C-alpha cells in the first residue's frame, strides 16, 4: 500500500512572531514517529516514510509539509487495520495543544496491491520449478520477500504466479545493489525448461 499526507500549518516569522506560527514540519515529525512505530516484524507489517519535504525558508515557520509512505503487509486485514491507524494519526494534532482547525492534514491512502497469498495452484507451480532446479543442479530456495509485485495482482484473480525467476543479487534498493551475472544463464535455463514442460501439459 501507499499513502501521501500533507500537513497544513500557519506561517509566521521564526523570530518576531514564533508563537503565532503552527509548524507543519513539527507536526509532520510527530506523525512520522507514530507511523514508523506501526512496523511490526513479528506480524510482517512494515511501514516506511520514504520521502519528506516541506518549508519555505529558514526563518519562516513552515506552513506546509508532506510525506510519502510505503506500507507492506502479508494479510489483507492488516492493510485495512493500517489504513485505520493512518487515518487516526492524520486526524489528530500531535505537536500542539490547540484546536485541530489550526493544523490540518490532507491524506490519500491506497491499498493498491494485495499481498501475494499462496494457493494450491501456485504451490503446484512452485513444486515443479524447484524440481527442475534440482535437475539442473541449482540451489533454489523460497522466502517471503516483502516486495511489491505485479504478480500479486495476477494471483489475486486466479492466475498462479511465481516471482524472482530473474537474476540473483543482493542489496536491493540501496547503493550496494548488485546482480550476479553468472546467474543469468542458470535462470534462463530454469525458465526455459519450466515453460517447455508447462506447454507440454
For each feature predicted by the language model, list its residue ranges.
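Metal-dependent amide/peptide-bond hydrolase catalytic core
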Residues: 1-201
Amino acid at each position: 500500500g501507499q499513502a501521501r499526507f500533507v500537513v497544513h500549518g500557519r506561517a509566521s516569522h521564526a523570530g518576531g512572531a514564533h508563537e503565532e506560527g503552527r509548524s507543519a514540519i513539527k507536526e509532520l515529525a510527530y506523525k512520522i514517529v507514530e507511523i514508523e512505530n506501526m512496523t511490526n516484524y513479528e506480524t510482517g507489517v512494515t511501514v516506511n516514510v520514504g520521502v519528506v519535504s516541506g518549508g519555505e525558508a529558514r526563518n519562516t515557520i513552515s506552513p506546509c509539509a508532506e510525506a510519502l509512505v510505503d506500507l507492506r503487509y502479508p494479510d489483507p486485514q492488516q492493510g485495512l487495520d493500517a489504513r485505520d491507524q493512518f487515518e487516526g494519526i492524520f486526524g489528530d494534532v500531535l505537536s500542539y495543544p490547540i484546536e485541530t482547525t489550526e493544523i490540518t492534514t490532507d491524506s490519500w491512502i491506497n491499498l493498491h496491491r494485495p499481498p501475494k497469498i499462496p494457493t494450491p495452484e501456485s504451490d503446484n507451480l512452485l513444486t515443479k520449478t524447484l524440481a527442475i532446479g534440482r535437475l539442473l543442479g541449482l540451489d533454489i530456495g523460497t522466502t517471503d520477500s516483502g516486495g511489491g509485485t505485479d504478480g500479486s495482482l495476477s494471483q489475486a484473480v486466479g492466475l498462479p504466479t511465481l516471482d524472482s525467476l530473474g537474476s540473483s543479487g543482493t542489496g536491493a534498493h540501496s547503493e550496494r545493489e548488485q546482480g550476479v551475472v553468472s546467474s543469468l544463464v542458470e535462470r534462463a535455463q530454469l525458465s526455459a525448461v519450466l515453460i517447455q514442460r508447462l506447454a507440454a501439459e
